[in-house]
Structures are given as C-alpha cells and as structure tokens.
C-alpha cells in the first residue's frame, strides 16, 4: 500500500493536502450557524416560490424559461427541507414527485434521455432558440434528482431511476476529431437542425468537455451512472480529461481551466461529489502520465486562496474586492451578465502534447471585471476555506436591502451579487443555479448531508466503481497516523512505518513531517490505534 501511495506522485508533482488538514463539515459559531440557516432558508424560498410550469423553478425571478440545472437544485433543496423544518416530509416528497413526474410526462424536452437547457416557463415546451440539449445542465439536473431519490426513496426514486436509465450518453460522444482533440469526448450540447422539430434530426456541437474542471468532471461522472454500457461512455474518459498545470502567486500548484478563471469552475461538481472523503486520484496508473495526481478538494482550496489573495491585493483598485469581497465568479453585474476570474501562472507539463495534454499558451490574463462579487461564490468557497464566512457576514450586514432581504418576513436572503461602486448596486433578479449552489454548498460546509445523500444512491456507487474511484468514511489525510489511508489505524500502519524507516522526505509514514521516519512516528501510530474519525459525516 505504501508503495502505491508513493507512486501516486508519478512524474509530475501531485496536488495533495497537508497531512492532518481539516476538512468539512466545519464547526461554526452559534451566530454564524444562525446566519447560514437563514441564508439557506432564503435560498430555499427562492427555489420553491418562483415557480412556473409543473411547479419547476424559473431560471431567474422574472425569466420566461426554466433551467433544467436549476430544477436539479430545486430537487436537492426539497430533499433537505424536512430536516430544516421548511416543509413536512409529506410536503417535500410530494413536491419532488410532482416535478419528476411532470418532467417524465412532458414531450419533446429530451433527446436520447438528456434535456434541453431551457424549457418554456408557461408551456413546458423546449426552447431551442435559447440553447440545445445540454450535457452539463442535464448532469446538474440528474445530480439533484439523485439526491432527492436517495432522500425520499419510493416513488421519487423510481422516477429518478427511470430518468437515469433513459439517458443515452453514448449519443453525445463526438466521433470525429475536434480542434486537435481525438474522438471520444462528450460534446457540450446537441442542437436540432430545425427548431420546429426539437427532437428531430440534429447535430452535436463541435465543442467538447476536455479539461478536468468541475463542469466536465460532473458531466463525465454522471454518464457513468448509466448501467447499460452501450448507453454510457468509456470510463477512461474521466482519466483522459487534461489537467493544465499552473502555480498560484503563493507558489501552490493547481489544475486550472484555460478558458475561464471564474471560481464556479472549481466547485460545482463538489456540490455533489464528496471530494473531502474521495482523496486523490491517479491518472498515471490508468495510462495518462501527463495528468497529475490530484486531490480536487485541495485543488479548489488553493483556487480559493488565489481568489482571496487577488481580491486583497486588488491591483486595479476596484470597489467591493478585499477580505470581505471574493471570489470572482460568473454573476449578474451592473453591466449585465459577467464572468470575471483569476488564473494561475501557467506551468509546462513535461512530455505533454498540445492540445491533447495541455492548452496552447496565452489567453489566461486575470479579469477582475468591475469588482462585482456574487454571494454564491463565497458560499461555494466555504466548502474549502472557512474565511469565506467573512464575506457572508459582511454581505449580510450591508445596508439592507442592498444585499439582504430577511427570509423570516418573506425575503429570499442574499441577492445574487453586489457592487459598492457608484453608490452601490445589487442584482434585482435571483438565479436558480446560484441560489441552489449557495444552499447546497452551505449544507455541505455545515453537515455534508448532500454529499452523503448523493453517494448513498446505488447508481452513484455504480459510477464510482466504473471509473475506479473510492470514497472513505473519514476525510482523506485527516489522521496522519493512518499511513495507508483506510480510516483505521492498525498493525498495517506500524508495518508501513518500519518499512520506510530512516531519512525519507515525503513519506506518508513520516507522521510528524520532519523528513525522517523514526521512533517518534512509530510511537504516534501506536498511541492512535483505532478508527480514524476525522471528518466523518453524520448519519
């Protein structure tokens, strides 16, 4: 086991957390708990009050369309409602079932079992004039549905299983080379040739999910929940997603997206996938040596640090940015929808081929936008960095109703985004994918419940097995004495210490991290014999 762990580094420096690093769920002060509960209730109200066709949430407060990704978050919110006292068990289950049955019974909104990004808020008809059948929005919808199915079981889960079994992901795999990438990657979307025939003949968009960021990983992962391999994708697609490398200004190595530095790109998959307990993966073992071993929770923590540092340094002197105004991510802004972001300093990958292994150079300059900060971004960062709580406290205390509308008197809590320049601005619209991300991220930071519900579903367990991913009951690396990382400190850990005895920098058996495996490490393991309970999720 120890040899395997050391080999995980491969030819590239791995992205691993410090041994013993704390992972969520976190313990919050009572005042912060109260604020987070209120914020979640506000987001829940937005997701269940601004409804349209079939009881589904509108994409935005006054939007003419429904986003299927937003519906996924609505279903996840309903799964959480009984524990919070927002709805009774029967009310939440009934609402979830009604939405799922409406989707199953609505014609023309799915092609090969995947869903149009947008459907009409009044009629439920697909809106190909807005966008096509979206793989990532379908993935977000399925993820939220899985959470609801896992939580309620029964007829709700029967409907979820019907949806998952109908999805033919193989029809969204590009069969030709696109932009220098070989065939086999998932397309972003399918579009009809004739908008009047939304599920007639059509073509896949010649753009693929190719990088191992959160939209890509969640989409590729959900494709593996299909038990019929003829309707799934190659499990190696997970490992083939390229991992561009960069260094943050603080000198930390990260995998990054060459197309967008917006923070949402680093956490949307982890709203559902329990990376704190999944630990690092190892593409080199799967035949992809130009993809580094990555603990994606740690990767997102480093991105959060990079965004925070950028906001504090604020080289352009923009309003809002600072210790209480970060990260930079996609949101509404005073000038419309904006996608600011932060990039690391690009680092070459030895032996990499372009563009299959790493992007062509250039095009990754930081974009601070106009300083607008989206509250859901801070909530997402809270899953990785507890200092994001400073942003949530500050935004709550801004002159109401600039950013906060009190849920206890009918408000929806945080507004989508705010900017303190020119007398102050905040978004008048609520976005379902932002409110949903905020609610789910805070739940994971507080309890990890969404992670548990998602991974409890047998179709998710199937996907984990298909790809070759594992999940522990404790936080990966949470107990330094657990040398072989199996959540139990036992005789095998003692043997691992003895086998690595001596000067051995970087060895997992170097419990006290002094670059030598010695008697003090052996004593530490002996003293800790028993289960590792660090980061265990509540039942």
Question: How would you name each of these model-derived features?
Answer:
Residues 10-476:
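Ser/Thr/Asn(+Pro)-rich, low-complexity disordered segments
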